[in-house]
Amino acid sequence: MGTVYGPNRINGRSRVEAIYEAIVGRIDRGLMRPGERLPSIRAAAQTFGVSKNTTVEAYDRLVAAGRVESRPGSGFYVSQHRPKRGEPPSPASIEAVDIIWLLREQLEKRYEVRIGDGRPPAAWMEGPEMARALRPVARPGQRILPESYGPPAGLPALRERIALTLAERSINVTPAQVLLTHGANDALDMIVRHFVEPGETVLVDNPGYYPLFGKLHLAKAELAGVRRNPDGPDLDELAQRAAATGARLFFTQSLAQNPTGCSITLPVAYRLMQIADTHNLRIVDTDPFADVLPATSPRPAALDQLDRVIYVGTFAKTLSASLRCGYIAADPDTVSALADVKMITRTNSSGYIEQIVYDLITSGRYRNHLKRLIDRIEVATRTAHDSLSRLRLPVFGQPAGGFYMWCVLPSGIDDKELSRTAAEHGILLAPGAAFNPEATAGPPAMRVNIAYANDDRFARFMRTIGATF
């Protein structure tokens, strides 16, 4: 095993960068060979004279860069496949990579116990309706695959159906105000590309949706967090930050928010729109769980009728993550501008997937699927509350309707270090730090997926390390 030696003092660089560069330098000089195990987090922290948390961030960056492999339960090893040399990553790219490490772990699915996963179990999305939809049979005279790209805004029939659905939520739009996308993340990417300028300050939920933070960092934006309360954004902080920064955009998730699971109340939604008017803010509101929530839930878009609100919806959370289909609803000028962005960056969305989604909706199969999904969410929410109560882990607010709960941890716990330790035991946690848009550390917490909260292995782990109250 090689030993990593590093500086005790670091000039002109962050400690994370210094550790990263020291290890990469030893790998490049052949002093650490492919397959060789890196020192443990504790040993490396002592060698460099830094905290374990700093070492974890440096190791995460090495993994993201492909220089090091993480093997749960074993440690970190020099990658067997050395990446091709090229231009060094920009600081914006490095920040985005640091933010999306949790997404990478969710996609690779290396952990058996998935407390921090963003998705429900696959069984929740399976059933006869889904099976039939994914094996479409063409009717006489009907093509299985579209013969051309299709209109830039997406399948007209699905856009019409979405407009009807939005009307049920008291959001009155024409089909021309609906732009189809490859899911909510794709929609957010287009919005960021169009609206956000380098160096601009953007307001976001804190805690909030970490993939969005990555997109904003890539756009070289400055992020200013707005504290999330159980009943919605902290309105005093929103007004103060809007006035202080001159921000033009506030990205939020009003209902079943990720990661807290809590929803905005009607009085807060009204006041939110008043603040938006006062400070000339556009509100980008993502509503991924809309189809399993009451149509009468308070939505800023219904109060505003898409004057200041850009409304983002998706079928990926409630249908299948593999069927990447979502939409943007906004005023006509905004939709037209975003359609241009879509054509330049994507050409168009998938007419084939859009046709599948449309058929599911109009045949009634999607409605039947949603009924089962709502039942599963309700049962899992009750079970998760019971399980976390037995562990004496307080749940933030009254989460309902989505997949998540936000658990407060004892003040002495480092949630990132807890996540690292859990990974060594084959447990995926989602530490609160991943959902913090700012460099300052917030109170220790973690996001819990309600579908997995009742796992005995998670309970034993939390009790063993004393991470409960």
Model-predicted regions and their roles:
Residues 204, 225, 283-285, 357, ...:
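Hydrophobic residues in well-ordered beta-strands that form the structural core
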Residues 139, 143-279, 291-306, 377:
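Conserved core of the PLP fold type I
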Residues 1-138, 339, 343-350, 359, ...:
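N-terminal basic, amphipathic alpha-helical segments
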Residues 70, 173, 429-430:
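Short beta-strand "wing" residues that participate in macromolecule-binding interfaces
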Residues 310-390, 396-397:
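PLP-dependent aminotransferase class I/II
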Residues 201, 222, 282, 394, ...:
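Residue-level detector of anion-binding/catalytic polar loops
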